[in-house]
């Protein structure tokens, strides 16, 4: 098709909320009015779908069909009524929140969202060649106008600044070991969603491109005088299939709705929030079982709380190579006894598994003969480089492969008592052009959907765990992944390198993931690759990591050292104290993960997400919100003993450590000892705590709450979810909730604490902590005050609760 004669469209058909525009050239555009705030556009240069089904779309549900969801399936959407007008030049549709105008000459789209009762224009396709109707090649393009002052957030796991403006990114998942958290691209994950935000207008929208193909985003790095300012999306294969999500009031609107659109985050066991030990060194050692036993002894010696250990792939070695599902009996002469020893101490094992079989793997011939591998055009295995050997990937679009994988996960791991799978090295780096996958009976070139293999691998692992222990909540970890990975796994930012720069930019990387629907995240504390961290860097990294949902110290240091809590005797006490702080905060973190599962709330977020009207919150910084009530300001530079932090306007903030209150809208400088990370509670906030004394051999769980009453008249409210922490009984309603309120007026603060639902154990007492500077009379009419005390800037009330 020539650019001289772009297609002219006319409304061809309407079936409910699905409209099809067709042209004489054969090109078509399909529109789907899915929700008041979500409209989808599908551009088909040849009038037909090129790409496979979708595994991304699971609106408000736990999953998609294993073999994918039909791209025209409207199940799960509200399909609201909408207004439609068509004249000679334009098709216009309008919901309560979105107005879309499509120019019939060329199909260019212009979008507006309703804000404050008025329509605000927020996005327009580029006036020149916004789409590729066969003008250049077979790739997919979408060019849109770039407006002054726009900021762009999301795109999943990306290096550099949180604002993606003026940068270019590639989604081509690779094993980027030792990456720079400031500059390296691409990385491990494929999440083609981003949020556009206009700070001046405090309005924005999300765009999600539903593609499994390698793709790229240019956010204004490229300039071309013939087209004006623009940004664009490009994919090597498939269709231009995108979702527009209105976000008129806060950036969180689009984030929540994108997470809802792509599936409910998994509700994982509570123990997944504890400290998880990890290193490659132990399992690489000839006496691996002995080294693993020493880890438990050191935890006991130094009173390091621990709930799990990531078992690196050295347990599968034959010589220097790794062979998935193979136990090295020389390193682990008593594998069952080894696992039992960990379980007796309350530490679960999360075993590393990889989806590639080396050519000399003991099971390679079996898998090859059964047709379980990705193949080339000649029917031979599609050979790839995998670590220091050649191998072939398993094909998870073949049901026989899935069955084989699940059987091996159960037999080689779960039957031994292994609690979880660590799905690693699963970027599926298949570069052979003619490699193909079975595609559930519809073979396709692997390069068109590599990340699909990653998603199906983690799902197969999850299903194996469910089948093995139907009553237990599965816990899984995956390094690579794509849209919807939150339905299955916890993840981390891969094999980072040891440096202060990594500590700083991993924070921003994690926030980018959280703004892309993936909240159960963390980073390798101390750095995976490179030299050993200094004592100061290690402690600061731990002090930052205690606020991440995934909390693991991991390493493969160049100098053969091991990142461990006790690697520096002068810092061990501070690290142990920080880990105990982590366990004190677990009830709050558990509640935040519940809100992620139920309300699609990001656990971590930049301050501007909660304070979009405060322009100072948009400046690049190292601060973050943990939920809506806790502001965290990690130290990311050597030698700092104090930390300046900007407090968002519109609220007062109270130091966790001193109880001192500060007005918002200003920067303050606070003490930052190694073992006291800077954290402030928002006015009106309630932070759930475990106030029991904790030791390695003696755990406890007793609930307390930090409460910051509203100044003047108002209500501080919060609480936390309570269940058994491990089983699926919550699905049958076996769950309770603490609710805490502090109702304030000029003279009094009235406290209310209730336990609702099916609490796993009803408490007789609870501790509430109010700032020591709270001078108003404190009342608790529904409870009896057993004790009052002031310590550390907080006034503690021990309440006896009614039965």
Segments (PLM) and residue ranges:
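Catalytic-domain carbohydrate-binding cleft regions of carbohydrate-active enzymes
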Residues: 4, 12, 117-675, 682
């Amino acid at each position: 098709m020539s650019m001289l004669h772009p297609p002219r469209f006319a409304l061809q058909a309407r079936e409910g909320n699905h409209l099809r525009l067709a042209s004489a050239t054969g090109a078509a555009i399909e529109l789907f009015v899915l929700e008041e705030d979500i409209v989808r556009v599908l551009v088909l240069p040849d009038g037909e779908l090129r790409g496979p089904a979708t595994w991304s779309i699971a609106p408000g549900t736990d999953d998609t069909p294993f073999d994918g969801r039909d791209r025209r399936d409207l199940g799960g959407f509200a399909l609201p009524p909408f207004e439609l007008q068509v004249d000679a030049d334009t098709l216009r549709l309008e919901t309560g929140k979105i107005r879309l105008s499509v120019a019939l000459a060329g199909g260019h789209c212009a979008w507006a969202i309703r804000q404050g009762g008025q329509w605000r224009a927020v996005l327009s396709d580029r006036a020149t060649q916004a789409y590729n109707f066969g003008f250049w090649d077979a790739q997919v393009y979408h060019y849109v106008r770039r407006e002054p002052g726009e900021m762009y957030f999301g795109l999943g796991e990306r290096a550099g600044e949180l604002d993606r403006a003026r940068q270019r990114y590639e989604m081509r998942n690779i094993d980027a070991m030792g990456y720079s958290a400031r500059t390296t691209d691409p990385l491990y994950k494929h999440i083609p969603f981003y949020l556009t935000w206009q700070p001046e207008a405090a309005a924005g929208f999300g765009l999600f491109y539903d593609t499994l193909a390698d793709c790229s985003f240019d956010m204004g790095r490229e300039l071309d005088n013939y087209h004006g300012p623009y940004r664009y999306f490009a994919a090597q294969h498939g269709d231009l299939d995108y979702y527009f999500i209105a976000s008129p009031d806060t950036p969180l609107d689009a984030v929540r709705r994108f997470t809802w659109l792509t599936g409910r985050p998994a509700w994982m066991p509570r123990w997944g929030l504890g400290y998880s030990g990890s290193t490659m060194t132990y399992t690489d050692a000839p006496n691996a079982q002995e080294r693993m036993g020493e880890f438990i002894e050191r935890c006991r010696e130094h009173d390091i709380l621990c709930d799990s250990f990531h078992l690196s792939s050295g347990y599968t070695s034959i010589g220097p190579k790794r062979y998935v599902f193979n136990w090295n009996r020389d390193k682990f002469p008593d594998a069952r006894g080894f696992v039992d020893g960990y379980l007796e101490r309350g530490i679960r094992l999360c075993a590393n598994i990889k989806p590639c079989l080396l050519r000399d793997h003991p099971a390679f011939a079996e898998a090859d003969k059964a047709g379980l591998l990705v193949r080339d055009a000649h029917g031979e295995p599609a050979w790839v480089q995998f670590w220091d050997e050649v191998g072939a990937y398993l094909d998870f679009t073949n049901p026989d492969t899935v069955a084989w994988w699940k059987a091996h996960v159960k037999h080689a791991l779960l039957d031994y008592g292994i609690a979880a799978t660590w799905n690693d090295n699963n970027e599926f780096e298949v570069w052979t052009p003619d490699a193909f996958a079975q595609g559930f009976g519809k073979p396709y070139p692997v390069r068109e959907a590599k990340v699909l293999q990653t998603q199906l691998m983690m799902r197969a692992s999850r299903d194996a765990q469910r089948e093995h222990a139907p009553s237990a909540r599965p816990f899984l970890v995956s390094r690579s992944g794509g849209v919807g990975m939150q339905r299955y796994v916890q993840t981390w930012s891969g094999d980072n390198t040891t440096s202060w720069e990594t500590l700083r930019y991993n924070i921003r990387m994690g926030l980018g993931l959280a703004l892309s629907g993936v909240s159960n995240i963390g980073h390798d504390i101390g750095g995976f690759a490179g030299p050993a961290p200094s004592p100061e860097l290690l402690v600061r990294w731990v002090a930052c990591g205690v606020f991440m949902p995934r909390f693991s110290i991991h390493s493969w240091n160049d100098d053969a050292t091991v990142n461990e809590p006790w690697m520096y005797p002068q810092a061990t006490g501070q690290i142990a104290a920080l880990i105990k702080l982590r366990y004190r905060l677990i009830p709050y973190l558990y509640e935040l993960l519940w809100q992620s599962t139920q309300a699609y709330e990001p656990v971590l977020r930049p301050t501007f997400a909660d304070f979009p009207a405060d322009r100072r919150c948009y400046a690049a910084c190292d601060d973050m919100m943990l939920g809506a009530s806790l502001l965290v300001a990690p130290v990311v530079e050597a030698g700092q003993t104090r930390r300046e932090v900007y407090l968002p306007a519109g609220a007062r903030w109270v130091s966790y450590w001193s109880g001192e209150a500060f007005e918002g809208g200003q920067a303050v400088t606070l003490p930052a000892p190694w073992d006291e990370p800077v954290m402030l509670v928002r006015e009106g906030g309630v932070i759930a705590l475990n106030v029991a004394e904790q030791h390695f051999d003696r755990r406890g769980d007793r609930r307390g709450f930090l409460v910051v009453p509203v100044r003047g008249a108002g209500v501080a409210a919060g609480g936390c979810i309570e269940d058994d922490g491990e089983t699926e009984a919550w699905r049958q309603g076996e769950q309770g909730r603490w609710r805490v309120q502090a109702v304030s007026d000029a003279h009094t603060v009235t406290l209310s604490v209730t336990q609702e639902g099916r609490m796993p154990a009803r408490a007789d007492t609870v501790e509430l902590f109010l700032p020591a500077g709270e001078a108003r009379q404190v009342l608790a009419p529904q409870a009896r005050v057993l004790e009052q005390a002031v310590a550390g800037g907080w006034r503690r009330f021990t309440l006896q609760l009614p039965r």
